[in-house]
Amino acid sequence: MSAIDVGVIGASGYTGLELIKILLKHPKFNLSYVANTEGGATLSELHPSLKGAFECNVVKVDIDELAKKCELVFLAVPHQAAMAYVKPLIEKGLKVVDLSADYRLSKDIYEEFYCPHTDVENLLHAVYGLPELFAQKIKKAKLVANPGCFPTSAILGLLPFMDKRVAHTPIIVDSKTGVSGAGKKLSDVTHFVNVNENLFAYNPLLHRHAPEIAQKLGVDFDEVHFVPHLVPVTRGMLSSIYIQVEGDFDAFSILSEFYKDAKHVRVSKNPVDMKSVAGTNFCDIYVKQKNNILFISSAIDNLMRGASSAAVVNANLMMGFDEELGIPNIAYVP
C-alpha cells in the first residue's frame, strides 16, 4: 500500500507539534496539509525546534482544499471548534481523529460540562479511541474521539478490576500532570514564578474529565472523585487511584491477564514513574493491595499517550496498519 496523505488542523499547540513530529517519521503517513485558524506562518516560525528538519507553510483551514489532498485528518483544536470541522470533513469522505472532547461523551453529559452540541449525528457514530477496549470498532470507524489524558491514565488503571467486578465505588483518582497539559497559551496559573517549586490542585472534584472517566467505566459521575494537580515538570502524568475491593484475588495477576495482549500497556511489579514513559505511547501500571483497599498507580506522557501518539495509533487502526507502526517506544531518559 502506498503512503496515506494526512493533514493536521491545529498545528500551533503542543499536541499539534507532537503529532507533526510523529507523522514526519511515520513510514505510511505522508503529512500533506498543515493548518490552523489564522494561517500565514511557516511551521518553523510556530515551532523553532523543527527548523532544518521540516518546513512548510501553515495555511488557513480550507475544507475543499484539504479534501483534495488528504484521506485522514487529525483535529488538534479546542472543544467546540472541532464540531465546526468534523461535519464537513465527514461529508467530504475523509476519516477524522479528533483530539478534543467534542465526541467523547453522550450529548447530555457533554452539554452539562461543556456547551451545546451542534453535531449530534456524528456524535452518535463516533468511536471512543481506546484500543484496549475498542480496537475492532476503531478499525471500522470514520470518526474516532481520542480520549482525554486524565481519563486515559485512570481508565486503563481501573478497567481490569471493574471488569472482574471486584472493585466498588466510590473511586478516588489523584492525578499529577506536567505544565504542558495546560497548553501553550500563556496564563498566570502556568507562569514560571507560579509553577516553579510549587504544587497545587485545580478544579477539584468538578474537572471536566471526571464525567469521561465515569461514563467509560459505567458508573455515575458522583461516584468518581477526581482531583488533578499541576506539578513543575514539562511533561508526564501520574495517577494515584484508590478503590475498595472484596474477595480473594491476586491484583497483579488480574492486571497482567487483562493486558497480556496490549501493545502499549506495561504492567510493573514496582512503582511506576513519569520519566520512564516520557516520549512514548506506553501506559505503565502498578498495583498494591492492603486489606480491602486497592492502590493503582498509572503513568503516561500527557502529550503522547494522553494525546498525540494515541491519535496516531487510532489512525493506524483506521487505515488497516499495525497499531505500533511509527509509534515511539523509547523513553526520553535522562
From Swiss-Prot:
The active site is at 149. This is N-acetyl-gamma-glutamyl-phosphate reductase. It comes from Sulfurimonas denitrificans (strain ATCC 33889 / DSM 1251). One of its GO terms (cellular component) is cytoplasm. CDD domains: AGPR_1_C (cd23934), AGPR_1_N (cd17895). Keywords: Amino-acid biosynthesis, Arginine biosynthesis, Cytoplasm, NADP, Oxidoreductase. The keyword Isomerase does not apply. It catalyses: N-acetyl-L-glutamate 5-semialdehyde + phosphate + NADP(+) = N-acetyl-L-glutamyl 5-phosphate + NADPH + H(+). SMART domains: Semialdhyde_dh. Gene3D superfamilies: Dihydrodipicolinate Reductase, domain 2, NAD(P)-binding Rossmann-like Domain. Its EC number is 1.2.1.38. GO terms for biological process: L-arginine biosynthetic process. Transmembrane segments: none annotated. Belongs to the NAGSA dehydrogenase family. Type 1 subfamily. GO terms for molecular function: N-acetyl-gamma-glutamyl-phosphate reductase activity; NAD binding; NADP+ binding. Pathway: Amino-acid biosynthesis; L-arginine biosynthesis; N(2)-acetyl-L-ornithine from L-glutamate: step 3/4. The lineage of its organism: Bacteria, Pseudomonadati, Campylobacterota, Epsilonproteobacteria, Campylobacterales. HAMAP family: ArgC_type1. Coiled coil: none annotated. Catalyzes the NADPH-dependent reduction of N-acetyl-5-glutamyl phosphate to yield N-acetyl-L-glutamate 5-semialdehyde. It comes from the Bacteria. NCBIfam families: argC. It is found in: Cytoplasm. It is an enzyme of class 1 (oxidoreductase).
